[in-house]
């Protein structure tokens, strides 16, 4: 028996779980490619004789596509196996970057053609997250959901930290080489997507360790396309119905939406402030990197914390720490290095907060509906991001940095208050005490 077989997985579940590991690797490669896109798109548009304003417009189209596609991506994943959805995403992104490379090498200056290709691969990339969550729910025991979420947090933070510098370095050599590198990342991601057999094996191993009442198990076909008997709109409505019917899920949607409004607006406000104060883009990058470093550090603690603390305690401590850091920024933002330290400290509890939410959703939602539920929960987050982006610019121009930072910090405090007053969130148990509906 090899170390990677399901029979030995309980000794070190995540490290031995090839279905999870290959999924995490595929997502890491896709997210690194995505993090490089900001540099790639900007350089590509300017190389086509476009202005910075035109580059911003193309980036806006991609962001808008990501938001709208994200609303229904979970529903789409629920109507196909997560493996097929991940293959579709990787393939489309690979072909998309090949198309952009061909466009660049042809000498074309068609911004419209470039935008259409980028919109297509951006839409496809939104299938990644719900596919990963569905595979995790199917193959990872409930006691390891916190660690699985922590790996995802660390992976995303690492991609954000290193993606832009790597892209800038490669672009300095050749823009064509950068485009080829991004396509290659997505192609390798396609190659490491877990096999159907691997997912089925770990699903069976999980269910055999935690047998469902009556000895039933969830098969691959059970979760492959649960919505095929109804329309995609009906599946979308079902995701919302499940969230609205569960007071805890509804509270999670409210808390995450409000918190994300604050965490989107405050960094932008600080960027505007430091730019207006004459700081170079390098120092602004250092500030954003400090937060990412904090998230990376915090991700190493999630497994330890989720084993010992209730999810409610994790969530309250995380939101409280972030709120305290944002309130501190109101007063210390004129001092750059003090702000960077506070940003790094505020990033440490974020993985625990996200892990507690994702672990609860994955443990308490049946596998067949996980994609649509995650999409429904993501709507408030995605809906408030553009509002926060707009508010940061408008309020900074009208009020200045201090008042704008205080405005956003108040929303973070409000999310903490909701965590404290909602019984469903205040009483969440430890991960080990959750009843896993997928076992």
Identify what each model region corresponds to.
Residues 28, 109-127, 338-352:
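Hydrophobic core of transmembrane alpha-helices in multi-pass small-molecule transporters
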Residues 40, 49-57, 281-288, 375:
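Small-residue hotspots at the loop-to-helix junctions and early N-terminal turns
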Residues 41, 127-140, 352-365:
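Intracellular juxtamembrane helix-capping segments at the cytosolic ends
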Residues 19-27, 86, 114, 248-253, ...:
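Hydrophobic alpha-helix/TM-entry signal in multi-pass membrane transporters
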Residues 111-122, 147-206, 285, 289-290, ...:
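Hydrophobic alpha-helical transmembrane segments
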Residues 24, 28, 36-40, 172-180, ...:
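A single, central transmembrane helix in multi-pass transporters
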Residues 62, 67-95, 99, 244, ...:
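C-terminal transmembrane bundle of multi-pass solute transporters/carriers
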Residues 2-21, 199-254, 439:
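Juxtamembrane intracellular "pre-TM" segments in multi-pass secondary transporters
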């Amino acid at each position: 028996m090899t170390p990677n077989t399901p029979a030995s997985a309980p000794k070190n579940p995540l490290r031995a779980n090839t279905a999870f590991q290959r999924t995490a690797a595929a997502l890491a490669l896709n997210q690194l490619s995505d993090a490089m896109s900001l540099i790639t798109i900007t350089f590509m548009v300017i190389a086509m004789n476009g202005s910075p304003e035109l580059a911003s417009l193309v980036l806006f189209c991609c962001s808008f596509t990501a938001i709208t596609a994200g609303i229904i991506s979970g529903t789409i994943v629920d109507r196909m196996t997560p493996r097929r959805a991940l293959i579709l995403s990787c393939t489309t992104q690979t072909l998309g970057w090949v198309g952009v490379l061909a466009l660049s090498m042809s000498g074309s200056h068609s911004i419209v053609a470039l935008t259409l290709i980028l919109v297509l691969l951006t839409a496809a990339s939104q299938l990644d997250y719900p596919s990963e969550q569905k595979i995790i729910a199917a193959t990872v025991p409930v006691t390891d959901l916190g660690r699985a979420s922590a790996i995802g947090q660390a992976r995303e933070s690492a991609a954000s930290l290193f993606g832009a510098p790597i892209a800038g370095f490669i672009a300095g050599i050749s823009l064509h080489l950068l485009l080829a590198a991004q396509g290659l990342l997505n192609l390798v991601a396609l190659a490491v997507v877990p096999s159907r057999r691997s997912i089925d094996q770990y699903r069976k191993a999980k269910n055999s360790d935690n047998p469902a009442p009556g000895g039933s198990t969830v098969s691959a076909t059970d979760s492959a396309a649960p919505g095929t008997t109804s329309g995609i709109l009906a599946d979308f409505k079902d995701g919302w119905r499940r969230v609205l019917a569960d007071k805890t899920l509804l509270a999670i949607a409210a808390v995450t939406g409000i918190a994300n409004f604050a965490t989107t607006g405050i960094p932008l406000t600080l960027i505007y402030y430091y730019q207006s104060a004459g700081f170079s883009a390098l120092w602004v990058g250092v500030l954003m990197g400090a937060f990412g470093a904090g998230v990376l550090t915090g991700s190493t603690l999630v497994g330890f914390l989720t084993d010992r603390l209730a999810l409610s305690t994790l969530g309250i401590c995380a939101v409280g720490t972030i709120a305290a850091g944002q309130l501190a920024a109101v007063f210390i933002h004129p001092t750059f290095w003090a702000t960077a330290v506070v940003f790094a400290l505020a990033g440490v509890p974020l993985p625990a907060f996200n892990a507690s939410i994702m672990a609860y959703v994955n443990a308490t939602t049946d596998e067949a509906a996980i994609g649509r539920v995650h999409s429904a929960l993501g709507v408030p987050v995605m809906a408030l991001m553009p509002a926060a982006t707009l508010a940061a610019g408008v309020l900074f121009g009208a009020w200045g940095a201090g008042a704008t930072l205080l405005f956003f910090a108040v929303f973070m405090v409000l999310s903490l208050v909701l965590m404290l007053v909602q019984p469903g969130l205040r009483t969440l148990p430890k991960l080990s005490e959750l009843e896993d509906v997928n076992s």
